[in-house]
């Protein structure tokens, strides 16, 4: 089982395929996505990787978190999430994950916080039909109708659909298809809508209801920081 990724929702647009069809897509960006920590069975009782995304100002980060990031030798991050993985899919701390982690045609599950709607009535919140527009109905046209039964059972059942707070909840949309990726700009474009507002953070994982993709890179599509530094150092020495 591979690690997922943290992405920022940039908005929606459309792409034109080779056959001329247009596809509505949501554009997601991997913003400085790095491995911050590892969780191992020997030390923690389970296997996982902790990822951080987005650059944060040091003054906006607590002292404990600053120490945590310093230990991993990465810059402070705005968003942190942990993903369970199998031992063979552990990623080195400090490695940067790129958009090539997913490929066009792959199905993914995306989770995020839905847009808050505030206090909503039963018709908007649960798609109720409401009461009649006339003929015996007074000031109750958009009400939900009966709340319970009679003396037996003498209560309102738990989970009864009524008016209440709507949105601002964690939502997972399954089996969204990746249409295109752009590794240079860190973009992943998926077909359809994704939970949350523009600028919100979402997590992307391989679809659990689809077979594990054979083309997927394991343990991940990474750009190790140490390798990048060695390459740049070698390039400078060669120029000299």
Curated annotation (Swiss-Prot):
The keyword Cell membrane does not apply. Coiled coil: none annotated. Methylated by PrmB. Pfam families: Ribosomal_L3. Gene3D superfamilies: 3.30.160.810, Translation factors. GO terms for molecular function: rRNA binding; structural constituent of ribosome. One of its GO terms (biological process) is translation. Part of the 50S ribosomal subunit. Forms a cluster with proteins L14 and L19. Belongs to the universal ribosomal protein uL3 family. PANTHER family: 50S RIBOSOMAL PROTEIN L3 (PTHR11229), LARGE RIBOSOMAL SUBUNIT PROTEIN UL3C (PTHR11229:SF16). This is Large ribosomal subunit protein uL3. It comes from Cereibacter sphaeroides (strain ATCC 17023 / DSM 158 / JCM 6121 / CCUG 31486 / LMG 2827 / NBRC 12203 / NCIMB 8253 / ATH 2.4.1.). The lineage of its organism: Bacteria, Pseudomonadati, Pseudomonadota, Alphaproteobacteria, Rhodobacterales.
């Amino acid at each position: 089982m591979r690690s997922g990724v943290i992405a920022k929702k940039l908005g929606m647009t459309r792409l034109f395929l080779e056959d001329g069809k247009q596809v509505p897509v949501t554009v997601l960006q991997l913003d400085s996505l790095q491995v911050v920590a590892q969780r191992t069975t020997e030390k923690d009782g389970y296997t996982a990787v902790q990822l951080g995304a987005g650059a944060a100002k040091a003054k906006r980060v607590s002292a404990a978190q600053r120490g945590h990031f310093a230990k991993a030798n990465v810059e402070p991050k705005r968003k942190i999430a942990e993903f369970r993985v199998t031992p063979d899919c552990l990623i080195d701390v400090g490695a940067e994950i790129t958009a090539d982690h997913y490929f066009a045609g792959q199905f993914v599950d995306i989770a995020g916080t839905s847009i808050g709607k505030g206090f909503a009535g039963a018709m908007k919140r649960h798609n109720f039909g409401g009461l009649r527009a006339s003929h015996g109905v007074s000031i109750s046209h958009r009400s939900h109708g009966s709340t319970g039964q009679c003396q037996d059972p003498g209560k309102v059942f738990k989970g009864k659909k009524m008016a209440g707070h709507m949105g601002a909840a964690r939502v997972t949309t399954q089996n969204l298809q990746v249409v295109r990726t752009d590794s240079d700009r860190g973009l992943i474009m998926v077909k359809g809508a994704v939970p949350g507002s523009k600028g919100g953070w979402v997590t992307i994982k391989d679809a659990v209801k689809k077979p594990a993709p054979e083309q997927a890179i394991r343990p991940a599509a990474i750009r190790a920081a140490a390798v990048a530094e060695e390459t740049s150092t070698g390039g400078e020495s060669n120029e000299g």
